[in-house]
Amino acid sequence: MNNKKTATNRKGMIPNRLNKFSIRKYSVGTASILVGTTLIFGLSGHEAKAAEHTNGELNQSKNETTAPSENKTTKKVDSRQLKDNTQTATADQPKVTMSDSATVKETSSNMQSPQNATANQSTTKTSNVTTNDKSSTTYSNETDKSNLTQAKDVSTTPKTTTIKPRTLNRMAVNTVAAPQQGTNVNDKVHFSNIDIAIDKGHVNQTTGKTEFWATSSDVLKLKANYTIDDSVKEGDIFTFKYGQYFRPGSVRLPSQTQNLYNAQGNIIAKGIYDSTTNTTTYTFTNYVDQYTNVRGSFEQVAFAKRKNATTDKTAYKMEVTLGNDTYSEEIIVDYGNKKAQPLISSTNYINNEDLSRNMTAYVNQPKNTYTKQTFVTNLTGYKFNPNAKNFKIYEVTDQNQFVDSFTPDTSKLKDVTDQFDVIYSNDNKTATVDLMKGQTSSNKQYIIQQVAYPDNSSTDNGKIDYTLDTDKTKYSWSNSYSNVNGSSTANGDQKKYNLGDYVWEDTNKDGKQDANEKGIKGVYVILKDSNGKELDRTTTDENGKYQFTGLSNGTYSVEFSTPAGYTPTTANVGTDDAVDSDGLTTTGVIKDADNMTLDSGFYKTPKYSLGDYVWYDSNKDGKQDSTEKGIKGVKVTLQNEKGEVIGTTETDENGKYRFDNLDSGKYKVIFEKPAGLTQTGTNTTEDDKDADGGEVDVTITDHDDFTLDNGYYEEETSDSDSDSDSDSDSDSDSDSDSDSDSDSDSDSDSDSDSDSDSDSDSDSDSDSDSDSDSDSDSDSDSDSDSDSDSDSDSDSDSDSDSDSDSDSDSDSDSDSDSDSDSDSDSDSDSDSDSDSDSDSDSDSDSDSDSDSDSDSDSDSDSDSDSDSDSDSDSDNDSDSDSDSDSDAGKHTPAKPMSTVKDQHKTAKALPETGSENNNSNNGTLFGGLFAALGSLLLFGRRKKQNK
């Protein structure tokens, strides 16, 4: 394969027995930077918090000025404090104030007009009631941005999920699985510095204590710091439990949805408020899976619970339990009820959903007697709904039923609505009731409750005017409202829609949803408005479904996170928007209908492998030969493009190695040189047969790469020199000189026999054994030279002169036998076995010289002058044996031996002749013989000297 590397991206190694290879050891430190995220209790749908403000000049009756009880504070809160609540100098920590607020100003006017216009007028100034609906939320932020895009579980191995086959009915939005109740983690969300404070507050001039005036712009503020354990997961829950006299919200009731946001507006947890239990249950979103070490603080607008805290100038225990941390504080409450007024009204509460005003009016609290009582309500910017039957008239039978909080227990009141006729006029903006109903006089007392709905056609903020026209005075009370800081004006009549659909695995990568393709569970999906503000987030269910509900007409943005191990498929394939993929970010428009076409497809990211082979390059040619074997146990390290080690392995018994599950990208392969081996030559042949060196850069692009090889051979660290010299010199000199002079003057017969036997044997054996055994991976050159010279010179000269002057017969026999045997054996055995990658020179020189000189000279002169017979026998045997053995490896010089044997030096006696002069003749004979022998010896010696 040629996709592996180029000349510019592969690093070769220069062969050198001293090369050192190193592995870069790279550690990834995950910085655990402190994540401090200030969460806030957001107001869903721009929820407004209202504070009712009453500003009046009416004199309070004596029973309204009772001294309140002592203001007591009880704190049962965990003493834990956040370790660091200050801003650091190294980073600018934003302090963001987000106000989802509406200030509702309610102005109440009470006018008393005499029936007789000509009489003296008596004017009573009434108090102005201002209802301020406001929400001020302060954010502080300390964010640790370690792992901003990674979940806390950083295992590279994706979590396995079981995905059920998706239903074919893609428009069946009800198939989306409902969120399951998670684990309660109250013990893992820790609160500290809890406090309940009065915002503004009013000081009682008599007692000097600060009081909560519920109808004079005051609100309560719940504040706390918190930390969240990292073990908290998406779907886990925790709770806020409010006490008997305390609830979230203001004059405007708390929304059922109570989301928690961070400073950037991201949803941390989704809260659901249950007014029955006065508890908010929060469910964590996947935000806690993406961030660690979350901590922060919050400030929440709260209010007195009017149904329970009913009496002015009374201290009530305001208690709250956040998670497992409880805090309480006693606060004096005052609603400003004016019991001397014949007509007074208050906003009992503002409905959070439709923003309707739920009003309560007290009629004839002083219990005056009238002959005329006409109660009229005029609405500006609001309307009555006659079909709702929520205009109620109750007769008061007990003065105590006029509770100060304007939230009477209607179950204890007498409902007399049916006894009166409510006349609606002015397009349901005016309601008139004659409270006399044919009676001539009456001192009856009434509590009237009404609901006024916002009129969407109105351009102003509206007001509610009351009049009580009696025979004595015409009383008026006016409540006006104004919204400030852009509170939500949406009403409950607006229809809500759904948006969402499906995330699936596009196994064939065609960008279209096929029937056999399954959904992907656990994909994060975020919903944003047209301005990029996050509205909601969710996670796909086991079938890959997701859905956002309760949305108004408008343009939205949906963002999909890429699940681990997947790659986004091609977006917007074909013309059918219901079955294509809309990509990672898409825009969805809601126009009077659900939009369930926002899908995203992913396919599993292909994984690739690289590797191959490390071999023993025995012939050092840099090529993989069929006879060459792999090397086991070579350490191979894989690094990514950043130099981080992502894998380490060792070659198997066949020299093979492999790295799997790799994405396309750039990598570096590092081979650690085995001890005692040397890097072979690199890039000598085809890419799948060569050596690539100690470090190799490789790029994988949608393919495997099994061409990354490396070869080594043994280092030349063993030198063997074996020199074997064998010199064998064998010199054999054998000189045998025989001089025989025999002079005989006689008349006898002379027989002279001269036998000369000269045997010269020369044996020269030269054995050279040179054994040089070197076992190593080196190269051995063994030269064994054996020179064996065996020279044998054998000279046998025999001169026999026989002069006989006689009358006798002279027989002279001269026999000369010269045997010269020369045996020269030169055996040279040189065995050199060398297995080595080094050089070994073994020189074995064997020189064997065997010189054998054997000289046998025999001169025999026999002169006989006699009449007698002379027999002269001269036998000369000269034996010269030379044995020369030269063994190389064991140097033993051979000493030549020269042996000359004269076996017949004694002349044979002639036979007796019977002469009387026998003895004399014998003496003469012996003398002649000795003379001949002496002459022979003398002659031989001279000859030798001359030679």
UniProtKB/Swiss-Prot annotation:
Gene3D superfamilies the UniProt entry points to: 2.60.40.1280, 2.60.40.1290, Immunoglobulins
Record's compositionally biased regions (Polar residues):
56-71, 84-155
Phenotype when the gene is knocked out? Bacteria no longer enhance SARS-CoV-2 replication in host (green monkey kidney Vero E6 cells) cells. Note the phenotype is not restored by wild-type protein.
Q: Where is this region: Ligand binding A region?
A: 51-495
Q: Which GO terms describe its biological process?
A: cell adhesion
Q: How does it sit in the membrane?
A: Peptidoglycan-anchor
Q: Which residues form the signal peptide?
A: 1-50
Instruction: List, alphabetically, the InterPro entries matched.
Output: Adhesin_Fg-bd_dom_2, Adhesion_dom_sf, Fibrogen-bd_dom1, Ig-like_fold, LPXTG_anchor, SDr-like, Sdr_B, SDR_Ig
- What's a single GO CC term here? extracellular region
Cellular location of this protein? Answer: Secreted, Cell wall
Question: LPXTG sorting signal: where is this motif?
Answer: 910-914
In this entry the propeptide is located at 914-947
Stretches for region Disordered: 51-164, 678-927
- Sites where Pentaglycyl murein peptidoglycan amidated threonine occurs are at T913
Enumerate the spans annotated as CNA-B domain.
Answer: 496-606, 607-717
UniProt lists compositionally biased (Basic and acidic residues) regions at: 72-83
Specify residue ranges for compositional bias: Low complexity. 912-927
Any matching Pfam family: YSIRK_signal
Which PANTHER family does the record associate with it? TOL-PAL SYSTEM PROTEIN TOLA
> What the protein does?
Cell surface-associated calcium-binding protein which plays an important role in adhesion and pathogenesis. Mediates interactions with components of the extracellular matrix such as host NRXN1 to promote bacterial adhesion.
Q: Which family does it belong to?
A: Belongs to the serine-aspartate repeat-containing protein (SDr) family.
Q: How does it assemble?
A: Homodimerizes; via N2-Domain. Interacts with host NRXN1; this interaction mediates bacterial attachment to host cells.
This protein is called: Serine-aspartate repeat-containing protein C
Protein species of origin: Staphylococcus aureus (strain USA300)
> Quick one: which gene encodes this?
sdrC
